[in-house]
Amino acid sequence: MDATVSAASVIAAALAVGLAAIGPGIGQGTAAGQAVEGIARQPEVDGKIRGTLLLSLAFMEALTIYGLVVALALLFANPFV
């Protein structure tokens, strides 16, 4: 494998994981904060808010996992070689 392609793949993998974690991390923090605020305002809808929050957190975390899959593909099954 060419050294330049190998180095570029490692950098791309690092960027894939890093950038894929930034958006969902910010979104999860915002969603959790808003959920706590909503539960504090209306404690009677605690179960509905918590269920919706957990489902949305799972969807956001899937984006990070997709970034990890792309990074692993770049590192171990390099399509550029």
Curated annotation (Swiss-Prot):
F-type ATPases have 2 components, F(1) - the catalytic core - and F(0) - the membrane proton channel. F(1) has five subunits: alpha(3), beta(3), gamma(1), delta(1), epsilon(1). F(0) has four main subunits: a(1), b(1), b'(1) and c(10-14). The alpha and beta chains form an alternating ring which encloses part of the gamma chain. F(1) is attached to F(0) by a central stalk formed by the gamma and epsilon chains, while a peripheral stalk is formed by the delta, b and b' chains. NCBIfam families: ATP_synt_c, PRK07354.1. Keywords: ATP synthesis, CF(0), Cyanelle, Hydrogen ion transport, Ion transport, Lipid-binding, Membrane, Plastid, Thylakoid, Transmembrane, Transmembrane helix, Transport. InterPro entries: ATP_synth_csu_bac/chlpt, ATP_synth_F0_csu, ATP_synth_F0_csu_DDCD_BS, ATP_synth_F0_csu_sf, ATPase_proteolipid_c-like_dom, F/V-ATP_Csub_sf. F(1)F(0) ATP synthase produces ATP from ADP in the presence of a proton or sodium gradient. F-type ATPases consist of two structural domains, F(1) containing the extramembraneous catalytic core and F(0) containing the membrane proton channel, linked together by a central stalk and a peripheral stalk. During catalysis, ATP synthesis in the catalytic domain of F(1) is coupled via a rotary mechanism of the central stalk subunits to proton translocation. The gene is atpE. The chain crosses the membrane at residues 7-27, 57-77. It holds the Pfam family ATP-synt_C. It comes from the Eukaryota. Belongs to the ATPase C chain family. GO terms for molecular function: lipid binding; proton-transporting ATP synthase activity, rotational mechanism. One of its GO terms (cellular component) is proton-transporting ATP synthase complex. Disulfide bonds: none annotated. It is found in: Plastid, Cyanelle thylakoid membrane. Its main location: plastid. PANTHER family: ATP SYNTHASE LIPID-BINDING PROTEIN, MITOCHONDRIAL, ATPASE PROTEIN 9. SUPFAM superfamilies: F1F0 ATP synthase subunit C. It comes from Cyanophora paradoxa. This is ATP synthase subunit C, cyanelle. The record marks E61 as: Reversibly protonated during proton transport. PROSITE patterns: ATPASE_C.
